[in-house]
Amino acid sequence: MNMLMVLTVNMMLSTCLILIAFWLPQLNLYTEKANPYECGFDPMSSARLPFSMKFFLVAITFLLFDLEIALLLPLSWAIQMPNINIMTLTSFILVSVLALGLAYEWLQKGLEWTE
């Protein structure tokens, strides 16, 4: 019963926050918000410059690898557990998947900035 209540409250809160995030920006629509702030001067160019696709892919790759490294942080705490073999195997599998992902990105030339 408690688990059902926790899930219900979490779903309601998530739905409420998502709806607020979609409705709130639509209240004050005017072009001044789309301009960059340049210390009171008129903007020299558009505020909505497109990102390079290479930059975007490198940034996403960095975030994925950073998240996978964060999964290894509890490893030092888990060494104190009585069944260390399972934790060692799990961490080895995680590092192997991380290394395979890095090798795949390297072979696909996803880490090269210049083409």
Curated annotation (Swiss-Prot):
Gene3D superfamilies associated with the record: NADH:ubiquinone/plastoquinone oxidoreductase, chain 3
The protein's role, per its UniProt record: Core subunit of the mitochondrial membrane respiratory chain NADH dehydrogenase (Complex I) that is believed to belong to the minimal assembly required for catalysis. Complex I functions in the transfer of electrons from NADH to the respiratory chain. The immediate electron acceptor for the enzyme is believed to be ubiquinone.
N-terminal signal peptide: none
Primary location: mitochondrion
Compartment(s): Mitochondrion membrane
Organism expressing this protein natively: Onychomys leucogaster
InterPro entries, per database record: NADH_UbQ/plastoQ_OxRdtase_su3, NDAH_ubi_oxred_su3_sf
Keyword Protein biosynthesis in record: no
Single annotated GO MF: NADH dehydrogenase (ubiquinone) activity
Protein family: Belongs to the complex I subunit 3 family.
Catalytic activity: a ubiquinone + NADH + 5 H(+)(in) = a ubiquinol + NAD(+) + 4 H(+)(out)
Topological category with respect to the lipid bilayer: Multi-pass membrane protein
Assigned EC number: 7.1.1.2
Gene Ontology CC: one annotated term: NADH dehydrogenase complex
Parts of the chain that traverse the membrane: 4-24, 55-75, 84-104
Keyword list, A-Z: Electron transport, Membrane, Mitochondrion, NAD, Respiratory chain, Translocase, Transmembrane, Transmembrane helix, Transport, Ubiquinone
Gene from which the chain derives: MT-ND3
Subunit structure: Core subunit of respiratory chain NADH dehydrogenase (Complex I) which is composed of 45 different subunits. Interacts with TMEM186. Interacts with TMEM242.
Protein name per Swiss-Prot or TrEMBL: NADH-ubiquinone oxidoreductase chain 3
